[in-house]
Regions:
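AAA+ P-loop ATPase motor domain of ring mechanoenzymes
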Residues: 1-124
Length: 124
């Protein structure tokens, strides 16, 4: 890991432009690494109302949520980032399209959420 961090820092120092890095794991980033950056901007996790809006507005047209899908409950129970919500929606949308269905299924949303939480080291 140290070798990879050193390589990344060297590439950043040699790059003539602006570099933007992103992480959902701020606690895992070494302070010495952070000191090398001019700006570090924290984006707080969206609140339940914001998550609800993200869930509902992320559904791509021409797909529609299945009648069993309760975005309000998802938003209330799952403290996740906007990026996670987008990944879950994309996963469920692809599953729907593969089936030839124009409805986002609650099961696909659940599967996608489990996958994303697993990637983050969290349970469902």
């Amino acid at each position: 890991a140290n070798q990879e961090v050193s390589y990344l820092l060297q590439r950043i120092e040699d790059f003539p432009g602006v570099v933007i890095l992103s992480s959902n794991l701020r606690a895992n980033i070494d302070e010495a690494f952070l000191r090398r950056f001019q700006s570090v901007i924290a984006f707080p996790m969206p609140k339940a109302a914001e998550r609800y809006r993200l869930w509902t507005e992320a559904v791509p047209r021409p797909l529609a949520p299945d009648g069993d899908l309760d975005f309000a409950a998802l938003a209330e129970r799952n403290e996740v980032s906007g990026g996670t919500i987008m990944n879950v929606i994309r996963y469920a949308a692809l599953r729907s399209l593969v089936r030839g269905d124009r409805r986002l299924a609650a099961d696909d949303i659940g599967d996608g959420l489990r996958r994303e939480l697993h990637k983050e080291g969290r349970g469902f």
